[in-house]
Regions:
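Conserved ABC ATPase "signature" C-loop
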Residues: 221-222
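ABC ATPase NBD coupling module
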Residues: 76-90, 114, 233-237
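ABC-type ATPase nucleotide-binding domains, specifically the catalytic core motifs of the NBD
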Residues: 80-82, 102, 106-121, 129-132
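Helix-to-loop junction immediately C-terminal to a conserved catalytic motif
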Residues: 60
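ABC ATPase "signature
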Residues: 227-228, 236
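Conserved ABC ATPase signature
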Residues: 142-146, 150
Length: 258
């Protein structure tokens, strides 16, 4: 199934062009093409093994495509330093990845310090304020002194502290309880709009994809089955697989479509 075309007038922040990747004999990505305009939130959803995390990790070179091109901004990632590329893109994982023996403020200031920002610690304090964890109250704590939701807020603060234009999120809220997850989703939507961030989110939860993504991409067996706004996917599923996913998630989708 081919992709729905994006707005050609919008500058592209991220682009995958006919990307393939194998893990041994397993085809993880099979000719995937995807354009994400600046400022858009795109959510990739699919079952385990669909290729969604592999595709996301191509954009910060944690995975190198076998063939095809990955473009960040207007440059092929292969001509960019992996270290500098990763420092220029925010990245949030499911379990946060915080350094356990560093206090919260130092964790958040890590990338600004590495990038040589003169106001690194001020930037970290501002990022903590944006996620609702003021540095005066939380900056001196260690990660183990925080709740799961608070740790993910710190991880989100760290991802935006160096003021990136792009953030990649790999199942960022998947390990949280339902209340913490809902609160953090709401905070993230407001934060993304305030900072005009381009975001690429991977999730197994179709309702979460609909809440957080302007566009939703459904992947299966290394290919894109369908792309579009959640309402369009629900109204006109392109394949039986997409229709089955929607039916399983219908109860969670109803509030989004009311």
């Amino acid at each position: 199934m081919g992709l729905a075309m994006t707005n050609s007038a919008a500058a592209l922040a991220l682009s995958a062009r006919s990307v393939t990747h194998r893990f041994g004999d397993v085809v993880a990505l099979d000719g995937v093409s995807l354009d994400i305009p600046e400022g858009e939130a795109t959510a990739i959803v699919g079952e385990s093994g669909s290729g969604k995390t592999t595709l996301l990790r191509c954009f910060n070179r944690l995975v190198e495509p076998d063939t095809g091109e990955i473009i960040v901004g207007d440059r092929d990632v292969r001509v960019q330093s992996p270290v500098e590329l990763r420092r220029s893109i925010g990245y949030v994982q499911q379990h946060g990845g915080l350094l356990p023996h560093w206090r919260v403020l130092r964790n958040v200031a890590l990338v600004p310090v590495l990038r040589g920002m003169r106001d690194a610690h001020d930037a970290a304090r501002h990022a903590l304020d944006l996620v609702g964890l003021p540095a005066a109250d939380f900056g001196s704590r260690f990660p183990h002194e925080l709740s799961g939701g608070q740790r993910q807020r710190v991880a989100l603060a760290r991802s935006i502290a160096a003021r990136p234009g792009v953030i990649l999120l790999d199942e960022p809220f998947g390990a949280l309880d339902a209340i913490s997850r809902s609160e953090l989703q709401e905070s993230f939507v407001g934060l993304r709009r305030e900072l005009t961030l381009t975001t690429l989110l991977v999730t197994h939860d179709l309702a979460e994809a609909g809440r957080l993504g302007d566009q939703v991409v459904v992947m299966r067996k290394g290919k894109i089955e369908q792309r579009g706004p959640m309402r369009a996917l629900v109204q006109s599923p392109a394949t039986d697989y997409v229709a089955r996913l929607i039916e399983k998630a219908r109860a969670g989708l109803e509030p989004l479509l009311a």
